[in-house]
Regions:
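Membrane-proximal extracellular/periplasmic loop immediately following the first transmembrane helix
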Residues: 45-110
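Short helix-loop junctions at transmembrane helix boundaries
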Residues: 279-280, 284-352
Length: 352
């Protein structure tokens, strides 16, 4: 390790450029992972906050909550671990003083069931009581919405009062507006014929009705529009960047080792064992990768702090730690190719 540090200090520019490349690759990887997790969270934040384990939908809905309608006659007897959810896309706008419109996901809940009672977490205000009160995603505050505002839904003349703002109220990358199932029936135009879009539960559910089907939450989330494709795209991009980092560190160390072969031959002729030189090369790779990865992490933290709240980015430290370790391991693995060259150096080359 002494030789590795000595060399890096002596060739600051060369090794600085290598670290710079590692920083850029690592930074891009961390940012991509943060954005992937941020987008994934905006797809599923509400569902995650409900702590649901299963959902019952209409069997013909193609595992889509917005396409599912559960008729009243098909509704099973519900227990304390189940909650009806009515969901439909909608457009909201303030009743006075503004013309801007926001596309949202309207979610109707039964006030006697567990999602409304225990899982709706508010950052301000209170839960909706009655069909003309709504709770908005707290992200809509940045759009100018405030407690006490009156809003309209889908251009109707009916006004709804904003009585609260909820945390983690995102579904399909859209803000949620919570209210009653009665309001959902009005927006959906179903009348009293249909009870809800789905039945969520924090346990596994048993379905006996032939018109309904139960799904795990994992299966349901994977079927959210664009969710799986979006995550797979980011995962492939991160994987390609890891391969690129492996190639970059291998090429740089290979070239540097080739340039140092005459020096290594002299050291071998002086009795320095090949194992010591190999250890120095691997030590260099460790120092370069750890330094570059730490700098990339610092850069990511600074970028996250400077980003506007509208940019979906989430730092998951356990996953970030795993990715950092993988980056370091790949870089060290890339140093094994130059190691083969060192092991083949002939001390007699220094005497020729």
């Amino acid at each position: 390790m002494f030789l590795a540090v000595k060399e890096i200090r002596h060739e600051k520019l060369r090794y600085g450029l290598i670290i710079g490349m590692i920083v850029l690759i690592g930074y891009l990887m961390f940012m991509l992972m943060g954005m992937m997790l941020g987008l994934a969270n905006e797809n599923t934040a509400a569902i995650d906050s409900w702590d649901a384990k299963s959902v019952v939908l209409n069997k013909n809905s193609n595992i889509s909550l917005s396409q599912s309608l559960i008729a009243k006659q098909d509704l099973p007897e519900l227990n304390d671990h189940q909650a009806l959810v009515g969901q439909t896309p909608a457009v909201i706008e303030r009743a006075k003083g503004a013309t801007d419109k926001q596309t949202i996901q309207f979610v109707g809940l039964d006030s006697s069931q567990f999602i409304y009672q225990k899982k709706m977490k508010l950052s301000s205000g209170h839960k909706p009581h009655g069909k003309n009160q709504v709770v908005l995603d707290e992200g809509l505050k940045s759009k100018g919405y405030r407690l006490g505002d009156q809003i309209t839904l889908n251009g109707s003349t009916q006004k709804y009062r904003v009585v609260g703002f909820a945390k983690d109220a995102k579904l399909n990358i859209a803000s949620i507006v919570y209210s009653s199932l009665t309001t959902w029936q009005t927006l959906k135009g179903t009348g009293d014929q249909f009870a809800a879009s789905g039945i969520f539960s924090d346990q596994k559910q048993t379905v006996k009705n032939k018109n309904l089907k139960q799904y795990s939450i994992g299966t349901f989330i994977d079927k959210l529009p664009g969710y799986a494709a979006q995550n797979m795209t980011f995962e492939f991009m991160i994987a390609f960047l890891m391969v690129i980092s492996l190639i970059v560190i291998t090429v740089f160390l290979y070239i540097l080792t080739m340039q140092k072969i005459p020096n290594y031959a002299v050291l071998r002729a002086q009795g320095i064992p090949a194992a010591y030189l190999i250890g120095a090369t691997i030590g260099q790779a460790v120092i370069l990768m750890v330094s570059g990865t730490l700098d990339a992490l610092l850069l990511m933290i600074v970028s996250k702090a400077a980003m506007p709240s509208s940019v979906p980015m989430l730092i998951n430290w356990p996953l970030t730690g795993i990715l950092s370790l993988a980056l370091v391991v790949l870089g060290v693995a890339g140093s094994l190719l130059p190691v083969r060259m060192i092991s083949r150096i002939d001390p007699l080359d220094a005497m020729r």
